[in-house]
Amino acid sequence: MAGHSKFKNIMHRKGRADAARSKLFSKLSREITVAAKTGMPDPAMNPRLRLAVQNAKAESMPKDNIDRAIKKAQGGDAETYEEIRYEGFGPGGVGVIVEALTDNRNRAAANVRSIFTKNGGNLGETNSVAFMWDRVGQIVYGPEAGSEDKVMEAAIEAGADDVESDEDGHTIWTAYDALNEVAQALEAALGAAKATRIAWRPKAMTPVSGDAAATLMKLIEALEDEDDVQNVYSNADISAEELEKLAS
């Protein structure tokens, strides 16, 4: 459940799609601005910016928004964002990693801590959770990319480490330093990915169900709704039956 695709599908079924899309565009814009500010403003010469722009396009973000986010980085009045990682535990002992981009460290920390506390979790110290995870490349395709066998064959050919497929699509995992190379090979074979990023992958999953699963969903939803938060990862293992029950 590291990418929370099933969580997101449930949230969208609950009628949150429009608000979630607006929030998503805001987060994508922030990543583009930070990427452009930390390197060259040309995606062809800035790998991080290239990935940020690709991810924005995959989410159908308008070109004007993308260009505006890049130009914002070149302005003298552009905000200075700090990248911060928070780690904690949710209901059922589930590990949670939160990545933030913020222009106010104190505000972000207070808000993230409050969200954990209000939703059955607790914020931990640095590396209280991350030591149980690997930092890897993650490439996500929808089910339209092809069958599990087709994607697996393309991933092996591209040099990927692992593939996970389900009804929501395909997640391809790569070594940290092989992401760009594998992503380019997969694009040639399968077309543009829905998302390409450096991500956290848990070494072991934590089963969770019932009330703990319901509260965990609220925790992750609240974290993802927080303006300063860019990505949320958990090692929750929730069965498909449990997720459908929670969605009803």
From Swiss-Prot:
GO terms for molecular function: DNA binding. One of its GO terms (cellular component) is cytosol. One of its GO terms (biological process) is regulation of DNA-templated transcription. It is found in: Cytoplasm. The keyword Transcription applies. Pfam families: TACO1_YebC_N, Transcrip_reg. Its main location: cytoplasm. SUPFAM superfamilies: YebC-like. Keywords: Cytoplasm, DNA-binding, Transcription, Transcription regulation. NCBIfam families: PRK00110.1 (NF001030), PRK12378.1 (NF009044), YebC/PmpR family DNA-binding transcriptional regulator (TIGR01033). Belongs to the TACO1 family. This is Probable transcriptional regulatory protein PHZ_c3068. It comes from Phenylobacterium zucineum (strain HLK1).
